Amino acid sequence: MKFAADLPAIRQAHARIRDSIHRTPVLTSTCLDDLAGTNLFFKCENFQKAGVFKARGACNAVFLLDEASAKRGVVTHSSGNHAAALARAAALRGIPAHIVMPSNSPQVKIAAVEAYGGTITFCEPTLAAREQTAQRVE
C-alpha cells in the first residue's frame, strides 16, 4: 500500500485548527542521532493543548462536521487521550461529546474529559463492551 500526502488537504486542516492548538516544538538529540546513525526529530505533541497528541485530529474531525451532524454531537470510546481530545474539540465547537470509557480508566483521564464537559458512560474494560456501549450511546 502506498500513501501520498495530500498537501492541499493538510494546509486546509491546518487553517481549520491553527487557532485551537499549540505550535509544539521539534527537538533533536545529537546523542540519539549518533546511536541511530541518522538525524532524528522529536515532535513534542505531549505539550499540546489538553495534554494529548490527538488534539489535532480531533479538532479537525469535529470542525469538519456539517451542522446537522454536529447538533447530534460526537461519540467515541477511549480510555484516555482520544477521549480528552474529542471532549475538548466538541467543547470548542459547542456540541455534546459522549465518551465511553472502560471502568479501569486512569482518574487523570476521566478528570480531563469531565473538565472539557464530556459526558462519560463507563463500561467493562473490553473492546466488545466499549463498542457495544458506544453504539447504545449513539
Spans of features found by a protein language model:
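PLP-dependent amino-acid enzyme catalytic core
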Residues: 1-138
